[in-house]
Design a protein with these regions (language model features):
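Structural micro-motif
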Residues: 764-775
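Short inter-helical turns and helix N-cap capping residues of alpha-solenoid HEAT/ARM repeat scaffolds
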Residues: 63-64, 96-97, 125-126, 158-159, ...
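Thiol-based oxidoreductase modules, predominantly thioredoxin-like and allied folds used
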Residues: 713, 741-756
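Residue-level detector of extended alpha-helical repeat arrays and alpha-solenoid scaffolds
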Residues: 38, 68, 101, 130, ...
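Non-catalytic, surface beta->alpha helical segment in thiol-disulfide oxidoreductase systems
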Residues: 777-803
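Amphipathic alpha-helical scaffolding segments comprising HEAT/armadillo-like alpha-solenoid repeats
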Residues: 24-26, 49-61, 80-94, 112-123, ...
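Structural signature of alpha-helical solenoid repeat scaffolds
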Residues: 76, 109, 138, 171, ...
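Cyclophilin-like peptidyl-prolyl cis-trans isomerases
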Residues: 413, 431, 438-661
Length: 803
């Protein structure tokens, strides 16, 4: 079944010698405070999607907040299918524990009900709870009557983080009124709000925001620039071309990648935006050090090649001498952009994936029919399946002979494609399809059977009623949706209580996975508490060597790399499906998610995000995070890169290290606040999320003297710095904005040995980072080293300045 989606190097920041090999982060031994049997029973309820009123009622009223927290999450997983649990979640929304309220909000969003409860939670005194409630409200966007109240939050929320979250998910409302609110957010003084406004507009084109988006192309925030670039490309106005061309020279590959894609969108609308004078920049970007940027430029090069011989020669050169991935993309670009009489001269001796790109590019072209006939009997099932996939729906009758011949193909994915295309012919043989539903029961994969069922559903859905009780859970779901069944059992549950207990015991220990590739290693921390069944399934497959000699068969620049398919064509799986374990984890950079083709269809395919992808939150199970290998391996991975093996628990865990920091850059030398916010992942969001105690800042104000200043020695690569420096940046902003106090600061980024830059760090005795040194004139008043002593950063700062 085709699965689609829509570095921190862990060393202690105090270490002065070269860091040891990376070790994975630890998790608490018993993070939920539940017995093995209790947790196992909840896993069983989730598997069965069973709303056991007695058990749920007891846990909702349980004196232990850990029980209430766990049942709040379970209600969302069960209710997403059964639409039950809303009253219980309404009760939990008033819980004294903020985590319970936050999870209740999340679960109501997963169910898609409980608007009034969510609006109440959106006004919660805890910003984290309120933000989660706002995100959940956006999942109720089918009810347009809720939009005015949602817009009030997006425009006026008092807490910056809550407003930013509301602005982010304006995209889900699919409404110009919501897009206009996103446009208004682009003018916010808050960097986080501007970023989320640009993100919302990057997901839905809105021409009314064009001018504001152009201004954001030079914003200091990398994500804001990247999102604005995509948004302008989706609008497709030629007036944005110069700004997009200039963005090819941006300092960050995310922006350059998005600029290349955006230029392609403009060129698709009108070739007149292209100018031969731009070719030096185009050629330079085609040799970018980032693999995703290079890949994204190939189609752009194809547009120029339509009119320019030099560009054409460059495209041919990439076909001959590029990497495997680049040669595949070049074949598609040549087939798409050049006359077939010329393209056919160079598109010879193609690999199967090159043929796939050519078939995709020529699907709607006159010569596409002949190409499909030529490749219909190709030896590789990847090619045969893509021949069928690229038959236009309106042209199925003309190629019915290819379709019918494929009905008896030896490969199940090819047969699936044949049944699917058969549904677009003028004379659909329903009996043939009904026979296939039965004959395909014994196939190693259910794709062909599902394809036949989907075609039957178009014209004879009632006949599928018996399949609502089919042994295959995915067949049950598809059939139930077709006949509008009120309820069905989502999964066949064959696990015993002892097996659930085994999963729980395993999940209570920290676990790691090492993806060994020819390109290098990717180190994962498995989120065995947040997604125990998914993480367990992944680990068991790895131990069975299931992933050996697979590849990352799908790479989308600045989005994801996807692997886990032994067929290496995005259609393979282990022959079974596991249920979703949607959780509160977010798709930030380096998140590891389970690829799906519908609810509860996960198996073995997984993906890793290059950059934040908030639209995936709450839709795909996150079961791991990269803690080493992002910049050096994930970012450079190309389609087809081989996975040698995946090893479980190859590295022992190390306690007290956060796994939320991914691929932090290593910079050395003087830094500015703007550069920190734009270059280091999560700094801007962490600054936004931190809310200093205003009374402490007010007390601090009279103690800050003229001539006071602070030197901050920090590591852009360091988790302690990433935790503490954004707090300090927020305090500086609030002192300036609310109390008119300017406190000069010098930021110095040091290397891991704390020896560089030698001229700035000499004599400072910096042994740990982050180190904040407060001076009055030339005299040091005190310093904050690595961790604050008080719960609030501003308390430690007040202690120093009040000396």
């Amino acid at each position: 079944m085709r699965k689609l989606l829509p570095l921190l190097l862990f060393v202690a920041c105090a270490t002065q010698q070269a860091p040891p090999p990376p070790a994975a982060p630890a998790l608490p031994a018993e993070p939920h405070g539940l017995t093995i049997e209790e947790e196992a029973s909840i896993l069983g309820l989730e598997d069965r999607r069973e709303h056991d009123a007695a058990t749920i009622g007891a846990w909702v009223a349980h004196p232990n907040p850990q029980h209430r927290l766990r049942i709040a999450l379970a209600l969302g997983r069960i209710g997403a299918i059964t639409k039950t649990g809303v009253p219980e979640l309404a009760t939990l929304s008033k819980d004294s524990d903020r985590r319970v309220r936050e999870t209740a909000a999340f679960s109501l969003g997963e169910i898609g009900l409980g608007a009034e409860t969510l609006f109440a939670l959106a006004a919660d005194s805890d910003a984290g709870v309120a933000a989660e409630a706002v995100e959940a409200l956006s999942k109720l966007s089918a009810d347009k009557s809720l939009l005015p109240r949602y817009l009030a939050i997006a425009d006026n929320a008092a807490t910056e983080g809550v407003r930013a979250r509301a602005v982010r998910y304006l995209l889900r409302w699919d409404d110009d009124t919501a897009s206009e609110a996103a446009r208004r957010a682009l003018g916010a003084t808050s960097s986080a709000v501007r970023q989320e406004g640009a993100y919302a507009l990057s997901r839905r084109p809105y021409a009314g925001a064009r001018q504001e988006l152009l201004l954001l192309m030079t914003d200091p925030n990398t994500l804001t620039r990247a999102y604005a670039t995509t948004a302008l490309g989706r609008i497709g106005d030629a007036s944005a071309f110069d700004a997009l061309r200039d963005a090819l020279g941006d300092a960050h590959p995310w922006v350059r990648t998005n600029a290349a894609i955006a230029i392609g969108r403009l060129a698709e609308k009108s070739r007149d935006v292209l100018n031969a004078d731009d070719l030096p920049r185009v050629f330079a970007t085609a040799e970018d050090p980032d693999a995703g940027v290079r890949a994204s430029m190939i189609d752009v090069l194809g547009y120029y090649a339509e009119r320019n011989e030099t560009a054409r020669a460059r495209l041919f050169q990439t076909l001959r001498n590029g990497t495997l991935w680049e040669r595949e993309l070049s074949a598609g670009a040549i087939a798409k952009h050049l006359p077939w009489s010329e393209a056919s001269e160079v598109l010879t001796d193609l690999t199967p994936w090159q043929i796939v790109r050519v078939l995709e590019a020529t699907a709607a072209m006159p010569h596409g029919v002949e190409l499909r006939k030529h490749y219909a009997a190709h030896a590789d099932p990847l090619v045969r399946a893509n021949v069928l996939a690229n038959i236009p729906e309106t042209g199925a009758d003309a190629e019915a002979d290819i379709i019918r011949a494929a009905l008896t193909d030896a490969d199940v994915i090819v047969r699936a494609g044949a049944y699917e295309r058969l549904g677009f012919t003028s004379d659909v043989p329903l009996q043939t399809l009904r026979d296939a539903v039965e004959s395909e029961r014994t196939a190693p994969m259910n794709d062909a059977r599902l394809a036949a069922i989907a075609v039957i559903a178009k014209s004879d859905a009632p006949s599928l009623q018996p399949l609502v009780a089919d042994p295959d859970p995915v067949v049950r779901r598809v059939a139930a949706e077709a006949v509008k069944a009120a309820a069905y059992t989502p999964l066949t549950v064959s696990r015993t209580p002892e097996e659930y207990a085994e999963i729980v015991r395993w999940s209570r220990e920290p676990h790691t996975a090492t993806i060994h590739m020819t390109r290098g290693n990717i180190e994962l921390a498995l989120l065995s508490q947040e997604a125990p069944v998914t993480a367990w399934n992944f680990a068991q497959l790895a131990k069975k060597k299931y992933f050996d000699n697979t590849s990352f068969m799908r790479v989308v620049p600045n989005f994801v790399i996807q692997g886990g398919d032994p067929r290496n064509d995005m259609n393979g799986g282990p022959g079974y499906a596991i249920r979703d374990e949607i959780n509160l984890q977010k798709y930030t950079r380096g998140a590891v998610g389970m690829a799906l083709s519908g609810p509860d269809t996960g198996g073995s395919q997984f993906f890793i995000t290059h950059s934040p992808q908030p639209h995936l939150d709450g839709g795909y199970t996150i079961f791991g995070r990269v803690y080493d290998g992002m910049s050096g391996v994930v970012d450079q991975t190309e389609r087809g890169d081989r996975v040698v093996t995946i090893a479980i628990d190859e590295h022992p865990p190390v306690a007290d290290i956060s796994i939320s920091n991914v691929s932090l850059p290593l910079e050395v030398g003087p830094m500015t606040a703007d550069r920190l916010l734009s270059r280091v992942p999560d700094y801007a969001q962490r600054k936004t999320d931190y809310v200093p105690d205003g009374t402490v800042l007010e007390m601090m104000k009279p103690y800050i003297h003229p001539g006071d200043h602070v030197e901050v020695y920090m590591g852009t690569w360091c988790s302690d710095s990433q935790r503490e420096v954004p707090k300090f940046l927020r305090i500086l902003d609030d002192l300036r904005a609310q109390y008119g106090v300017e406190l000069p600061v010098q930021f110095v980024a040091v290397d891991r040995s704390k020896q560089q830059p030698a001229e700035l760090i000499a004599g400072k005795h910096v042994e740990k980072v982050a180190t904040f040194i407060y001076y009055r004139g030339d005299a040091e008043l005190g310093r904050i080293v690595e961790h604050t002593q008080s719960p609030l950063f501003e308390d430690d700062l007040l202690t120093i300045v009040a000396k």
